[in-house]
């Protein structure tokens, strides 16, 4: 199976967690896009979705799914999203698609976070994938200096502005042995909006696409 076929398999597998009559939290990226396609088959059974990016919002609306602003919603049963890396503790690096802040906000509200990914995203230690950090533009250089002190090599993601109007620093060369401590340390830097480490709030369920089928891991 190709990588895209594995992504499609987990996107459709996540449909089993969608309860009729609910509002579904939806992530961003190529794997989440397959979940949105699958969700389109249930558009008459769900109330709608909360989206983590403008791109996902457009796709949801194109399929006839009502998109709620998060401020209109009291609670979310599930949030379904991909990951750039996921470890054995269900902690993740996310933000390759630059939607990390909205993704983290929606994940924090959801009762259950379902991570959908192909097997290539599984790692023992997080950090080989460059760690995205969303930063207020005026603080870019100041934040970069602090990230160097934490052992990373920050690189400005040229030409990218987040949906919130901020910039992204991708931090290379990190071997993140204590993801919770690293998440807290980076989030404490003035000017950081959020870091793409999902360690304090990791996934509850991981659906991993393998050539032998979809593997389910429960926290």
Swiss-Prot record:
What switches on expression, per the entry, is described as:
Constitutively expressed.
Catalysis performed (reactions): aldehydo-D-ribose 5-phosphate = D-ribulose 5-phosphate
Q: Where does substrate bind?
A: 28-31, 81-84, 94-97, 121
Record note on temperature dependence: After incubation at 45 degrees Celsius for 30 minutes RpiA retains 90% of its original activities.
Report activity regulation: Inhibited by arabinose-5-phosphate, D-erythrose-4-phosphate and D-erythronic acid.
* Family designation: Belongs to the ribose 5-phosphate isomerase family.
**Protein name (Swiss-Prot/TrEMBL):** Ribose-5-phosphate isomerase A
Taxonomy of origin reads: Bacteria, Pseudomonadati, Pseudomonadota, Gammaproteobacteria, Enterobacterales
